[in-house]
């Protein structure tokens, strides 16, 4: 069984970092994701050491590995042969600071959304929201520096340039109590005239 503790996304694809928690992992072994229920083939996995990666055919409990092309696996997922095993997840803090992001060029909104979602795969403390009330795209993080780094990565990795601003607040009103209102309308202009009496 393996536990996914990190995901790295760039313009070339996604790399998934994992730790072998129990048993033995062999090349081409098929494991089931306990979160999504999907099966993933562990075709080629490597042991990372700085920028160098060494491919292995077998890994044992305690080994750290990296693999690409896992389609339905994210950080905090557990993969095992039975698919019923789930290891304790890493507790990431909830992001609290938001900035609006606006495309610098026309028609780049879909590209921006797709690129930000790749960043959120990599950093679980980032969050993306397309706010239906304010019609704004919002990116949430733990502070200004993290959000600035995210915007910089959008440009350097995916070629997406955005402008940031303050998010708008969607104000709401609600009915607090029951009231009654009465109104009368009178108009006399020499003819039959007009009269109305309304209660609400």
Regions found by a protein language model. Give the residues of each.
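Conserved cytochrome P450 K-helix/beta-meander segment immediately N-terminal to the heme-binding cysteine loop
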Residues: 200
